[in-house]
Amino acid sequence: MSPAPTLTPPLALDYLRELSADIRSGVVMDAKGKLLAGPKELGEAAHDLVRAAGEAEEIHVSLADGAVFAARSDKHALVVVCGRLALPSLIRYDLRLVLADLEGGTRPDAPAAA
């Protein structure tokens, strides 16, 4: 594991979009659900999703035309909306990676190759 550079919330969203072309939109919130970056209309729904998930650190909701993924830490939550061809394991890894960068923490190890 390597130390992560610190990102601002808007840069964290830009970085996520660079990591995956499947991400259509996303938000960054603080631990209390305050929107830090991303569209306001998505922020309200994202806040409700994270709050409803209790203490879950990761969330994956599949829909007919896509999926919603979320990851959170003690300081931030990231929620992204993806197309239906998004690979769940890669999106979850990217979310954890960007969370670490956002907080200046340690990056997770890359998934093992099959």
Please describe what each predicted stretch is.
Residues 1-114:
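Non-catalytic interaction/Regulatory regions outside core domains
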